[in-house]
Amino acid sequence: NNPNTRLVCEIKPSEISKARGVSVAEETVKLIRSLKAAAMVDYISFDFEILKKIKEIEPEAQVQFLNGNKSPKAIKKAGMEGIDYNHMVFKILPKWVKQAKKEGVILNTWTVNDPEMMDWFLKNEFDFITTDEPELLLQKQKSLWTEGNS
């Protein structure tokens, strides 16, 4: 067992209502607490209200916003830990990378399969990169690490 392994729990926005999404978030947190897994779970959602509710009922929870329409400064102000945005958001708004680092906001991106884009995110020291090509990304990460330590 790797104590550093984390579980990512995505709570989808409700198509029925915002209230339903918030209710699902509450029930999800209760379930994770009952499983004594709270310390190893990160929550992600495209619904900002869902994440705000999670932080309200579980202040220690690690949450990351997926939608891509809030700045790192706004995420920090809301008491959230990170942003997990589609890779194109960061290509369009590269200033958000610096802002996230300044604010201490976790940088996470998805889904990066293009080798040149992998290089860009690695060079910008993202905390997490979601990819369908993990072998290639690991190879690039090792090469970059080797270059930096020569």
Where are the regions that the model predicts?
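Short loop-to-alpha-helix "cap/lid" segments that border enzyme active sites
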Residues: 2-150
